[in-house]
Amino acid sequence: MAASLDGFIARKDGRVDWLETSDEFADGDTPDPGFVETFLKTIDCYVMGSRTYETASSFEARGFGWSYGDKPTFVLTSRDLPRTRDTVEFYSGDLVQFVNGRLRPRFRAIWFVGGGVVSGECLRLGLADEVRYSILPIVIGHGIPFFERLDRDIPLHLAEVKAYKSGMVELCYEVRGHRGEPRNATCQQQVRRMAQVSVLHSVGVHLTRS
């Protein structure tokens, strides 16, 4: 998930016009489009909130395409939203039951792509194994925070840092267990394979099936 330096994923009204922000960092890496495409094929399904879904749908309506391919996409919402694709399904029940009872048995790599409420709930409920966070070189002052509704501290382990020529920095954190160790023993190896995801395809909270 891409965010401003001050931790916002969108403006208060949902606009993300600042996502095209870039700078010049001579020592940074250049994203490999081929690697991004290969990486996206490893994702089994996406989970998102209604605001993220509406933003993605608006991008598609303006000719930018659907960012999530033909992968199953689950939208967490209690609102009556238009279903624009056959791969989209809406859900409004208990999140823990949905993830553990329905998604984990079917999918190995489950990616929560926002927004702030969904990402925060995923962490708060102990569902996440990994958090990926792409920081753009801009401060917007106000907006929708990366994580909302957190009621406790969540200890993390920094597994990977990647800086790009555009000035974007990508961070990957493993979510630690109750004793401080990373919850996913194979996460370090996975992180190295997934280090070059570009900002257009950055995703937030990652779950893996045991």
Residue ranges of each PLM-predicted region?
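Enzymes that bind and transform nitrogen-containing heteroaromatic metabolites
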Residues: 1-207
